[in-house]
Amino acid sequence: MKLGFIGTGTITTSVIEGLLKSKAKIGQINISKRSKKNSLKLRKKSKKIKVYSKNQDIIDKSSIIFVGLLPKVATKELKICKFKKGQIIVSFVSTLNIKNLKTLCNPAKVIIKAAPLPMASDSLSPTIIFPNHRLIKSLFELIGSVVVAKNEKQNNHLWVMSS
């Protein structure tokens, strides 16, 4: 499994640290240089981590792409990226709904929203996901508990409560 992370802020860094401590069978973790401090720190933790300056390089080398960008930056960045049909996109961006993400990440069809918390680094994060996806749920279960929202409206309410 090759994971890609666009954006390396607090949440993304916590998720990666948690996954590295877990028993996840990850072949490679491709990350962006967006936060130079965090990306360098992560690279030192594992030889599985590769740092790229271009988001497209991360997308081209990953089967599951996690989007951990600020809302204002996410739309702009995703518009210029080219995704593949079989890729799974997991968005940590609160303001982008599934419909918008499907448009921005086309032709990728599998889009999941996820709201992990910084405790993911210690495998203590309650993570909200929508819609349910077996593989993504199992990844987040490695870094804490998972709550699957019934629909996007419930997902949005749960996100507000977790922030």
Regions found by a protein language model. Name each.
Residues 18, 41, 76, 80, ...:
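Solvent-exposed, charged/polar functional surfaces in cytosolic regulatory/catalytic domains
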Residues 16-17, 75, 102, 137:
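Predominant activation on well-ordered alpha-helical scaffold segments within soluble catalytic domains
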Residues 161-163:
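Glycine-rich phosphate/pyrophosphate-binding loop and the adjoining helix
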Residues 10, 37-38, 72-73, 96, ...:
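Short alpha-helical
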Residues 100-110, 125-159:
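Internal alpha-helical scaffold of NAD(P)-dependent oxidoreductase catalytic cores
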Residues 38, 46, 54-129:
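Rossmann-like NAD(P)(H) cofactor-binding subdomain of soluble oxidoreductases
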Residues 1-53, 57, 61, 124:
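NAD(P)+-binding Rossmann beta1-loop-alpha1 motif at the extreme N-terminus of oxidoreductases
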Residues 1, 27, 49-50, 87-88, ...:
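A structural micro-motif
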